């Protein structure tokens, strides 16, 4: 029988005991050092009054948002998007069954709640019609006929990672919708998916600027020469930060992004808070005419509605100049729209939400006889079928979403878009994190999200008794008022009588 080497075992225990003692001593020393640092520093009162343990306050504050999201928040409590909304998009993007059981968890009595009016004789499946395409820019040399009523809103390469842009581009092509470049310029990754593209011109004019930073006609022609580029959008303001230019932190300005934008790498990319060369409504119409003349393609603008007297002035000026001078479309962004980075003071308090601004703009265009000439695009937290159907009822011709498609890519609402450490690889340029986002897989999810959203918007339309979603009108929906009773949207937003239509006017 072999006798155990007790000497080796004893030595091992001695080493282990010594290691534990040294480790304990180092921990005590570290606590003493932290204690001294805390009581001598003057910047933070908690650490000075409660040395050492005061650090736990910051730790718990940081992880608290994750506990709230995963353990404590109810399905319809979170902001900006609750779990019910996110889950619908996740399942739609994965092409999974999106039915639920037992009953709705949505409260139907709070003021502002939207209710659709079902028809006693809903549209039969065999009577349903395909969503009709709509032509934008009938006065242009190259008008654009858009098939999908739901499309990808502006998100720039820079704010988004390379694989995210690749997935969106390929998915949009499969889903039959357009993708907006955002204000960061046209990247090769926007083009490689072969989707229809809306090129956005921001206040810094990235991608179409000359050496002095001004709009270049030659650069416009270069961009317009790509057959995938169908329209141009002048970004006047953004929902999350009206009056503030785009912000891309220097950590996200790589050499490639800097080259596309024409700026130094590694430095913060901060756009002017408005277009320096657009000082009036006349300047805006002149800029639209200039870009349309140079490119031959539809041109519109994106804006958050706040001071709304200018809308009547704009329409009056358009009618004075003639319908050809009008923007081919207007994108209405909501005050609760998304962003990669914005001051909280603007994000929380500036501008009107789309539920107020969209009917206002639609009515203003109708009043001036321009609703058929100028197509309306709604944007801002419209990520589910009900929200899209509401926008169609109120007067939108198209709906665009950014964060809805981010959820389709796998976004978990970590709220780290501005920190370059997005855990899903969508808004980071960290290669290690980007590898989690496989463009070919996520492109399928983008396409499935488009397919399933359009399908369920159709389900709502058929329940309302119309053959396709574009036939939805204000009388098909109601809104709960303060007294708990619902009011028809046709009563709440009484549409103005339209003067003579300009739809019959053709390019001469």
Identify what each model region corresponds to:
Residues 209-236, 353, 362-363, 374, ...:
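Phosphate/diphosphate-binding loops
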């Amino acid at each position: 029988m072999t006798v155990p080497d007790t000497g080796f075992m004893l030595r091992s225990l001695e080493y282990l005991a010594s290691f534990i003692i040294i480790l304990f001593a180092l921990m005590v020393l570290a606590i003493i050092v932290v204690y001294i640092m805390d009581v001598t520093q003057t910047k933070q009162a908690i650490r000075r009054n409660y040395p050492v343990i005061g650090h736990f306050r910051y730790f718990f504050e940081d992880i608290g948002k994750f506990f709230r999201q995963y353990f404590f928040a109810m399905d319809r409590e979170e902001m900006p998007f609750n779990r019910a909304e996110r889950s619908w998009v996740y399942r739609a993007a994965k092409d999974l069954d999106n039915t639920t059981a037992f009953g709705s968890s949505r409260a139907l009595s709070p003021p502002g709640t939207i209710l659709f009016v079902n028809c006693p004789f809903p549209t039969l499946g065999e009577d349903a019609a395909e969503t009709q395409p709509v032509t934008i820019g009938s006065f242009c040399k190259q008008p654009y006929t858009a098939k999908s009523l739901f499309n990808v809103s502006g998100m720039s390469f820079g704010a988004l990672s390379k694989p995210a842009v690749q997935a969106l581009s390929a998915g949009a092509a499969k889903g039959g919708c357009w993708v907006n470049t955002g204000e960061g310029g046209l990247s090769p990754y926007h083009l490689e998916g072969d989707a229809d593209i809306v090129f956005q011109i921001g206040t810094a004019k990235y991608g179409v600027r000359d050496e002095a930073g001004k709009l270049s006609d030659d650069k416009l022609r270069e961009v317009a020469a790509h057959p995938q580029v169908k329209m141009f959008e002048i970004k006047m303001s953004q929902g999350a930060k009206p009056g503030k230019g785009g912000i891309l932190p220097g950590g996200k300005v790589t050499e490639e992004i800097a080259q596309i934008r024409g700026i130094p790498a590694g430095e913060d990319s901060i756009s002017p808070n408005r277009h320096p060369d657009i000082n009036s409504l006349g300047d805006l119409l002149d800029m639209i005419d200039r870009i349309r003349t140079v490119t031959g393609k539809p041109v519109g603008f994106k804006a958050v509605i706040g001071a709304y007297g200018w809308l009547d002035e704009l329409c009056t000026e358009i009618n004075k100049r003639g319908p050809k001078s009008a923007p081919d479309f207007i994108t209405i962004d909501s005050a609760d729209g998304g962003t990669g980075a914005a001051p909280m003071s603007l994000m929380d308090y500036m501008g009107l939400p789309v539920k107020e601004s969209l009917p206002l703009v639609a009515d203003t265009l109708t009043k001036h006889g321009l609703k058929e000439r100028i197509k309306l695009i709604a944007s801002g937290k419209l990520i589910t079928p009900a929200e899209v159907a509401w926008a169609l009822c109120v007067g939108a011709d198209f709906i665009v979403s950014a964060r809805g498609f981010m959820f389709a890519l796998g976004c978990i609402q970590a709220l780290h878009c501005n920190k370059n450490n997005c855990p899903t690889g969508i808004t980071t340029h960290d290669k290690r994190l980007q590898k989690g986002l496989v463009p070919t897989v996520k492109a399928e999810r983008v396409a499935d999200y488009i397919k399933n959203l359009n399908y369920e918007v159709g389900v709502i339309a058929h329940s309302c008794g119309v053959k396709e979603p574009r036939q939805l009108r204000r009388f098909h929906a109601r809104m709960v008022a303060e007294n708990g009773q619902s009011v028809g949207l046709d009563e709440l937003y009484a549409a103005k009588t339209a003067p003579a239509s300009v739809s019959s006017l053709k390019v001469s």
